[in-house]
């Protein structure tokens, strides 16, 4: 599955996670990407979309 939203271009972000003793370990934060059938330029197409775009109505789902 793709790790980037095709609508808002949101992708994986890298950073550092701190434990209770303040030791660091590298990790990534991935967006919640869903595979959705949506209307793109008048035709239904399968796209990878983050849930933020789905909830905000930036994507019209094909039913």
Swiss-Prot record:
The lineage of its organism: Bacteria, Bacillati, Bacillota, Clostridia, Eubacteriales. One of its GO terms (biological process) is translation. The keyword Ribosomal protein applies. It comes from Clostridium perfringens (strain ATCC 13124 / DSM 756 / JCM 1290 / NCIMB 6125 / NCTC 8237 / Type A). Belongs to the bacterial ribosomal protein bL28 family. It comes from the Bacteria. GO terms for cellular component: ribonucleoprotein complex; ribosome. Pfam families: Ribosomal_L28. Keywords: Ribonucleoprotein, Ribosomal protein. Gene3D superfamilies: Ribosomal protein L28/L24 (2.30.170.40). NCBIfam families: L28. This is Large ribosomal subunit protein bL28. InterPro entries: Bacterial_rp_bL28, Ribosomal_bL28, Ribosomal_bL28/bL31-like_sf, Ribosomal_bL28_bact-type, Ribosomal_bL28_sf. GO terms for molecular function: structural constituent of ribosome.
């Amino acid at each position: 599955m793709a790790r980037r939203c095709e609508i808002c271009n949101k992708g994986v972000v890298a950073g550092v996670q701190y434990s209770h003793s303040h030791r660091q370990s590298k990790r990534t934060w991935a967006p919640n990407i869903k595979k959705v059938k949506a209307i793109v330029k008048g035709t239904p197409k399968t796209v990878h979309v983050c849930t933020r775009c789905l909830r905000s109505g930036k994507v019209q789902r094909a039913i």
